[in-house]
Amino acid sequence: MKLRPLHDRVVIRRSEEESKTAGGIVLPGSAAEKPNRGEVVAVGTGRILDNGEVRALAVKVGDKVVFGPYSGSNTVKVDGEDLLVMSENEILAVVEG
């Protein structure tokens, strides 16, 4: 199944983070914080402005992004994989390089 977000929404695959502390202690799944990085897998058509025009999104499929800890509260399961759906304005930065 393919997910196509609407308007200014973005679908993100959360990155897998290491579940070890700097000291080498392995954290159980419940103690580890969810990573706040991911890869954009789908983008909507753009944000609808007050004058009716559509502004294209600044992120594109394949971008590695950073988002806030409470961003992407909408999680959907597609083909057994949990994906986040969030508005573009919830993305804090694009990781380059």
From Swiss-Prot:
One GO biological process term is: chaperone cofactor-dependent protein refolding
Any single GO molecular-function term of the entry would be: metal ion binding
Coiled-coil parts of chain: none
Q: Kindly list the places in or outside the cell where this protein is found, as annotated in its UniProt entry.
A: Cytoplasm
Checking Gene3D superfamilies in the record gives: GroES chaperonin (2.30.33.40)
Q: Is Transferase tagged as a keyword?
A: no
Q: A GO CC term? A: cytoplasm
Annotated keywords: Chaperone, Cytoplasm
Q: Which NCBIfam families match?
A: PRK00364.1-1, PRK00364.1-2, PRK00364.2-2, PRK00364.2-4
The UniProt subunit note reads as follows: Heptamer of 7 subunits arranged in a ring. Interacts with the chaperonin GroEL.
The UniProt family comment states:
Belongs to the GroES chaperonin family.
Functional note: Together with the chaperonin GroEL, plays an essential role in assisting protein folding. The GroEL-GroES system forms a nano-cage that allows encapsulation of the non-native substrate proteins and provides a physical environment optimized to promote and accelerate protein folding. GroES binds to the apical surface of the GroEL ring, thereby capping the opening of the GroEL channel.
UniProt protein name: Co-chaperonin GroES
The protein's gene is named: groES
